[in-house]
């Protein structure tokens, strides 16, 4: 699969630059237009076959970027550190070919340092939480990531189909005690088939996912500070029997998943809709203890969206996501036969999360440029529970956002400016935690307080691009962001990018 993706992506980079009669600045403005994105972007994220039916022109872009994140008064997500220094390269493309077909692809590379990561020794934290390996020392983590994905799409009369594949690899490590070294891989593949009606379309798709991570932790000095490692199980609890200073640190994650969904259009393309279901089961093993099976995390995700273009200047989109995490922990025997066996499995951890949003886009076109106004509202609910010792945490937030932008083309120059502000408040929140480790309980309470404290977020972005002979353009982009919450806590972000588009 990786070789096939490489062929597709090389073709994207070396493809002719004159596939579209539109200038690069015009195509860039179309791809950045939030009005055009309503419905089309969400449908294309579900399956690449939807991109073939979208109004997007052929377009390619490659950029080198530097990301900076700084936080004060602790990290909003301590497991990912309170600061980030990251260099990255991203290239992506959608190329419409002859014969009603198209190819798309994306490549990415990231090299980063996560500062002061605590209570997490495992890569892909957001995917595997809460079943990660943690320690009470923490420190900087080196992060390296490669990603590739490609798709082929074709339309034949009233039928449309696509084939898609992706691969992501992550390497994380620390150069002082405790010294985790994590290598993970995530592979996806799917196929879609759809039918076009006189005034709409419907596309169904299905896919397979395979995940793997190998984790090893070593020490140069086993008699230093607190170097105990904990197999975390959620809401302040851990697998007490397998606490260690390295004996039970080698861990292997193995997962498989399925996905299926449907997207469609109606009312001559003014209506878009989609529904998808994802399932991923990841088991965790002690790889240096006869592959003793510790736990299994099952994550189910249900997504849906609907959008409608009321007029050429106004569109709306509603989306909802439901995620359920369920953790089964195994009771392991004493290995009298030399092999650890699971004698009982218990459902110990559950979390239900709901995210619902409603947004609109108002577009006003003038001779000198185009204005956009994008208001939105979002509701979020989270409910976690641990069976024994009985613990639970739940909260709900409501946020409103107002964003706007202006873009204009003057001669060979394109300028795109955007800004937004968002306020989030807590509707309700409560918790009851019991834990043998005070540090774990305090960290859970701290996370709860950060999520339930009102926050103010703001961001601004400026893009300047110069076209060269109508076939190629060079651009620079500056993005600034900030989040302010609690008693003086804040997160500031900066991204600087330079690149080409064609």
Residue ranges of each PLM-predicted region?
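Transmembrane beta-strands of outer-membrane beta-barrel pores
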Residues: 66-72, 109-113, 154-158, 167-171, ...
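Outer-envelope beta-barrel architecture signal
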Residues: 56-62, 99-105, 157-161, 198-202, ...
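Residues on the lipid-exposed face of transmembrane beta-strands in outer-membrane beta-barrel proteins
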Residues: 89-95, 148-154, 189-195, 260-266, ...
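Outer-membrane beta-barrel "beta-signal"
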Residues: 24-27, 197, 490-502
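Outer-membrane beta-barrel translocator domains and adjoining extracellular loop/strand segments
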Residues: 72-79, 116-122, 173-181, 215-221, ...
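N-terminal, post-signal peptide beta-strand-biased segments of exported outer-membrane/organellar beta-barrel
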Residues: 19-115
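Residues that define the transmembrane beta-barrel architecture of outer-membrane proteins
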Residues: 83-89, 142-148, 181-189, 254-260, ...
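Long, internal scaffold/assembly segments composed of regular secondary structure
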Residues: 237-375
